[in-house]
Amino acid sequence: MAGAKEIRSKIASVQNTQKITKAMEMVAASKMRKSQERMAASRPYADTMRKVIGHLANGNLEYKHPYLEERDVKRVGYLVVSTDRGLCGGLNINLFKKLLAEMKAWSDKGVQCDLAMIGSKGVSFFNSVGGNVVAQVTGMGDNPSLSELIGPVKVMLQAYDEGRLDKLYVVSNKFINTMSQVPTITQLLPLPASEDADLKRKSWDYLYEPDPKALLDTLLRRYVESQVYQGVVENLASEQAARMVAMKAATDNGGSLIKELQLVYNKARQASITQELTEIVSGAAAV
């Protein structure tokens, strides 16, 4: 019965692992609901800011802010939003693959890339592949605040203001639903013109009080901060959804493995009993 004992030990081990993955699935489901609420609360502000900026980009402005002007591209920057923890399926690696493909396209044109990382998984990955990480923030937890993001955002905006960057993007996972999270790369600077057909057919003249430069400086920075924050909360909701799905799959796979091991155990036990009976019958026949 040595084989049967070993199989029993494997079954017990899988059952213990299954309990852990089931608990993690339930925790992720609870955190996902909270993350979705936070995402839904911030999304209207981010969307409205995007519309306002779309108006500005299409407007006839008396003061042309540097964030509105296209430049010859020699260096681009990416604010990359990843997770601090693993066990969330292919969420991070799918995002990294998309970014690496875009970085290669820039590299083929002779354009260099700077990276500001939000999340420890992105930091470790891009350090390992030789990415130029110029800023990072990790360990923000399940309730990130805008103040925690100011560091990387400030570094990239300062580089853009000084002409060391010619384009700036935010890279994150967009939450569609529990089963679908899409890696996205969104241009922040220079401000992209709105894709709204109505806006393209019209133009606006703006009057600024008191000073257009001061107003636009504040508004455009708020816009960048709001889009990065929205990317973070969307990525957090995506993380919890992906983890819940991954842990459910692990729990289900554990159940299937237990059934297979139980079948192997029953066969081994049956073979052992058959062998013992054969030995008894053979011994009786010999007598």
From Swiss-Prot:
Coarse class of the protein's main subcellular location: membrane
Single biological process term from Gene Ontology: proton motive force-driven plasma membrane ATP synthesis
One Pfam family from the record: ATP-synt
Source organism, top-level taxon: Bacteria
PROSITE patterns the UniProt entry points to: ATPASE_GAMMA (PS00153)
GO cellular component: plasma membrane; proton-transporting ATP synthase complex
Listed InterPro entries: ATP_synth_F1_ATPase_gsu, ATP_synth_F1_gsu, ATP_synth_F1_gsu_CS
Keyword vocabulary terms for this entry: ATP synthesis, Cell inner membrane, Cell membrane, CF(1), Hydrogen ion transport, Ion transport, Membrane, Transport
Subcellular location: Cell inner membrane
Membrane disposition: Peripheral membrane protein
Family matches, as SUPFAM superfamilies: ATP synthase (F1-ATPase), gamma subunit
GO function terms (MF aspect): ATP binding; proton-transporting ATP synthase activity, rotational mechanism
Disulfide bonds: none
Record text on subunit structure and interactions: F-type ATPases have 2 components, CF(1) - the catalytic core - and CF(0) - the membrane proton channel. CF(1) has five subunits: alpha(3), beta(3), gamma(1), delta(1), epsilon(1). CF(0) has three main subunits: a, b and c.
Function statement: Produces ATP from ADP in the presence of a proton gradient across the membrane. The gamma chain is believed to be important in regulating ATPase activity and the flow of protons through the CF(0) complex.
Family statement drawn from the similarity comment of this UniProt entry: Belongs to the ATPase gamma chain family.
Protein's UniProt name: ATP synthase gamma chain
